[in-house]
Amino acid sequence: MGEMLNENTSSTSLSSFYVLENETIFNVQEEMEEDGSESGNIQKTLLEDPCPENVNDENEDEQNRSSRSSSPLVKHEQRHRMYNLKEVIKSFILTKSKEKPCDLEMGIDSIEMGRMQSFESDQQESHTGQANFPTDQEDPRNPQLDSQYEAFITQGESQTDKKKTSTVQEEELQNAGKKLETVQENPQAYSKVTQQEPQAGQKAVPQEPQANQQETSSNQEESSFDRQETQDDKQKPKTTQQEHYNLRNRNQATITNSNSKPQTRRSKIFVISLLGYGVYLLAFLDLIEYVSKEYGFEATVSAQIFLWCLFGVLMIARGLIYLALFRNFLNILKRMAIYCGACFWVYACIFFLTRVFCFLIDTPYPQFEKIPLEIYSIFAAINVYIIELGAIYCTSGR
């Protein structure tokens, strides 16, 4: 009798399982076609009838229920029903979700792995007659993976905290830079705004007098500090463009009386050059007189030769000085070009002045023999001094 009851219950349970399976699949397909949602409706249909026990007759005894639920055939039918549902979901995903191929492949792989595991468990049940289910004592989690996951989470949180702090610091620096720019552009207006801030705070929030008093005191301190800064800026001497240029080149924070140092340096160089070239001219005047007497050259021709030789010597000396000071070849060429341009420009000016002088003394320009040698030597000396002064001014400090 017991065997007959078990067979009847198993047959009724099989028929009820097949009916339930068809109903759930039909419900899943209808809800997917109506709503278009993939996960919520499937969960609803599965939650409505999670187990086939609700289909059984109400008159069954508890013994029949326990024996039916513990039988391996019932468990096999449950697995079969669940994997049929997975096949329906898989077909639906293959037809409708084409936007995420990676998720689709992962879902298909997980379904295939589950199918292989179920096949292995069915084989074990067929050999041993017992289902291979994990016991309560076995822990499926891996402690190494848990520790790695916790370390990964803490590392990500620390990185996000660092990013937040860096962004906050950048915003504070930008706000401070904007505040400094506004103070430098219009310090008086900024001081007025800081003076008016506590009054506006007192009027706006009369319910909190202590907080307003603290805000007004802090605002007054800031306004007094801003006033002191503006007064210090006013007391400082105004700097010129050349001083700003020197500050930028030398990378110095503060330089007092920076305009006096280049002037003293230039004056020293100019005095030394005057003395040196004065002696140079006196020596060459005797040489010009000797050449003009011995070889029959005119004084003007010998003076012109002297000037061109002097230009050559000056350019060679300048080139050696620049080579000692500046090792960069392009910088040397640039400074020599400035020096040569200054030399030829001043030389043209000197010849223009000589023509004006010839016009004033009523002599034609080509007749240089009527011009005394002393006057021509004076012009030559002035020429040399102006050239040296222009070269010093053009090349020093640049």
UniProtKB/Swiss-Prot annotation:
Residues 210-222 have a biased composition (Low complexity). The chain crosses the membrane at residues 269-289, 305-325, 341-361, 373-393. Its main location: membrane. Residues 119-135, 183-199, 248-260 have a biased composition (Polar residues). GO terms for cellular component: membrane. One of its GO terms (biological process) is meiotic cell cycle. The keyword Ribonucleoprotein does not apply. Coiled coil: none annotated. Signal peptide: none annotated. It is a multi-pass membrane protein. The keyword Iron-sulfur does not apply. It is found in: Membrane. It comes from the Eukaryota. Residues 224-236 have a biased composition (Basic and acidic residues). Keywords: Meiosis, Membrane, Transmembrane, Transmembrane helix. Residues 30-81, 119-260 are annotated as: Disordered. Has a role in meiosis. This is Meiotically up-regulated gene 126 protein.
